[in-house]
């Protein structure tokens, strides 16, 4: 996915009220960005480091600028826009990058499914193949060299694991796909120290037949895309 028009840069001052961040531009002026990330962004906030943001020409938007990337103290990059994970996953599936998810005829998004009033992120279907239900999660939490999900207690994430297990019990294929939007993460594990129930459910889900995949993003101020698989430690 290319950033069009090109991203602009500034220096992070603060994130507040969950969805807002103040940034200083090169001329010394300050602007407020929309922060498209509902998580805690634990270990992703580095005041004084460079951020990259997009600008919308929609006059109805209260905040025209959206925070897209964050530079780390180690000169790495973090994808802040968690909502882009589904688009990145769809793009990678269509290009055959995620080899485990090739060979299907159609791809649909946000399809109702399950017993708990859910919508699946991606549904793959093909002739003479079980339907494949894919739940996509953005992973950005890095601690002591290990990537973790979630970065806060996630009742929604727990629900999705139950739904995926239900799909397997119905004879379908179910996949949990971690989109790793942190250039310094090379393996993903459940964050049992943050959400022990999620970690427990993930182990149960794997035993029930839910597949878990993780793919790292290649990121720059001009584009972002899924590039290669990485290790998952359940």
Curated annotation (Swiss-Prot):
InterPro entries, per the entry: SfsA, SfsA_C, SfsA_N
> Example GO molecular function term?
DNA binding
Identify the stretch annotated as signal peptide in this record: none
**Which family does the record assign?**
Belongs to the SfsA family.
Identify the HAMAP family for this entry.
SfsA (MF_00095)
NCBIfam families in the record = sfsA (TIGR00230)
Q: What is this protein called?
A: Sugar fermentation stimulation protein homolog
Q: What is the lineage of its organism?
A: Bacteria, Pseudomonadati, Pseudomonadota, Gammaproteobacteria, Alteromonadales
User: What would be the name of the gene that encodes this protein?
Assistant: sfsA
